[in-house]
Amino acid sequence: MIRWRWIWFSISILLLVVAQPVSLRLRFDRSLHRMFAPDDPTRTDFEFLHSQFGVSDLVVFAYRDERLWAKDGNGLERLQRIRERIEAIPGVAIAMDLSKIDQMLEQLDQPFAIFRTPKGNGTRHVLLDEDNAITDAFKAIFEGQTHSRQGTLVAIACLLKPANQTTIAVRETLLNLRQIGDSLATEGLEDGMLVGQPVMVEEGFDEIEQDGKRLSIVSTTCLALLILIGFRSLRWAIISIAVVQWSLIMTRGLLAWLAWDLTMVSSMLGSIVTVIGVATTMHWMLGYQRAMKSQSNPEEALRYSMVGLWRPIVWACITDAIGFASLAFAKVGPVQDYGCMMAIASLVVLVGIFVLVPTMALLPVVPKRFAKSLGISYELAQIPGDEPLRKCLLGILKWVNRWPVAVAFAAMVICVIAVLGSLRLKVETDFIKNFRSDAPLVVAYQAVEKELGGAGVWDVILPAPKVLSQRYLDLVMDLEAKLLALEVPGMESLRLTKVMSFADVDHASRASPILGRLSIEARLMGMRQVMGSFVDTLITRPVDEQRFLRIMLRSREQAEAAQKEQLIADVRRTVDEAIRTDEWIVLFGDDAAASKAAVSGYYVLLTQLVSSVVADQWRCFAVATVGIWIAMSIALRSPWMALLTVLPNALPSFCILGWMGWTGTPVNLGAAMIAAVSMGLSVDSSLHYLIRFQRERSDGQSFQAALTSSQSEIGMAILLSTLALVLGFGSLATSNFIPTVVFGITASISMVGGLLSNLVVMPALLILSLGPRSERWKAN
């Protein structure tokens, strides 16, 4: 590699030039239903909902207007102007509000208007007519959907076009809606609010993209500054940045070429590439620094360090790849993709290290007499505090030598307690808690939760006869009454706050002198004329003798996980019981489609999202452990020594999950994959430590001398790389997306835990299993 370094370096630059434009095509898959296994009922029900009604993304545009019900109609006319601006957005399919309902009622009222006694207020708006029965009925139906009970919070329900019907991205549609909200000052109103599951998901993904870029930049910058300040080497600072950034671009280019998309699970791709690249670069740099003390020139020092380090570097990246590849055993597609992506990234870092470092480490930039002052000489300075740090590391080893049994026993006890705690894990189901409490989205949601009856929007899909009958609609309304009666106890009870379907709209329309005299199908045709495609979101047109009716549900988003899961289960049970009654069976006869009902929507998806991601965590963790043990057995040529690495590497993730279990801290997306990630973060250090120990022993060093050398030299590399990465991960604590904050904190804690495990638990296990004390035990 060193002899042909310029050839390899040229090839790497050529690959970089090719991969850079391709990497820009890597996309985010922002669909939530793919976060579930293909056969998961939650996913199949959602896909069924989407296939029947097409439009399933509901966004609520809300604002405050004290004059909404003004007798002069000023409030409704202002609302109409705002709605028409929203309807002009290409990505919006339907916008339903009070002004549209008012227009519909006016059309129904016009043929009989000449027989009405004129009102004293001279209003032109039927919706403002307090003596109109149909007006009162429609106000009641849409309360919580288009306006609050108090009447000051106005809502426009915006149904977005599905992806197959528009080229406009959801992000662009939401941006246009926000621009309208920001312009309400021209109407004399406060800025508008935008809520809805699509809004939460899009904002979450936006934050994740920004956080991934931030972590990559901050982590590599921290490492570069550490090298620049500590070792006074601009050369190696640039090398570390080059390795990480080259690996990132190449990985993203490969994924784009393979037509893979990033998801919410794999969004932290850059962070893991940074971890592997930083740790590997730091180990080689310190190995090169040691070699420079005994070798005559930089090339010999680099060759000497490469001979000593190629094996741990190669196997560290391979074990990383194996650990991540274990996620392919998960049932969820994005988790499988995440594992494959990270396995590829691990191998790309391996290539990047060997094609970039030899050339850049030996690159003659300026004459030697100027190189040192510029920080680009071949030599590296001693890091400030080097001797005290090494003494501290050896002091830890001395203490471990004295109490190895106590250390190992304490580690086992902690591990058992942590495992028991991890069995008590709860998942976070309130997606709004993924944002900071002062975020505009959270403030808007709190208003909707309080005044519109809840921000959780979901649906029941029921089969409907080809020709609607009054008996069928009565059964639907009976079911709605049962759904409204459901209540889940808790500190604050949870129930459905709104239930609405075509049956309610039809019932209210019968108060109209026109529609009340018509058949149900005729009323349906009339409503299609005045309400447009909104009716098609409530009931489908007959296709192959089948049609479906949609019951729109609303409930509080901010509730305990157990309550939300219980409410979903109760709704499913109630619906299942309803479609199995004798009356239902008589109505449909032998039609098999009569039993095809579903409960779905973003509320259901978000409630069960984290549970879906963590469902296979322990199985994947077990596969990763076995895979890493096999790889370590080959690398160390000792299955027993490889087994010694399992506990230190598993301990950090057990401790994090155990702490969350015992304290009742809900697991969100940021902590969902920490077990697999943590294993990959700490195994590299163990491998470097043990291979150095083996090499010292094969060179004739005593057990204690080999352990001391490993603790002093490799321990320093572990300490410095951990410091740089903890600073990088710590930068995520400033994110506005709470799962990113949790990921940064748990990853930092995991790395510190891995550091302690490798510098305390690992030596204790080596002493007990391979040291002089173990030989005495065997003799006894």
Regions found by a protein language model. Name each.
Residues M1-I13, K293, R303, V351-C415, ...:
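Interfacial helix-loop-helix hairpins and adjacent transmembrane helices
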Residues A291-I318, R697-L720:
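Helix-loop junctions and hydrophobic alpha-helical segments within the transmembrane domains
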Residues S51, E77, G122-L234, M477, ...:
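Extracytoplasmic
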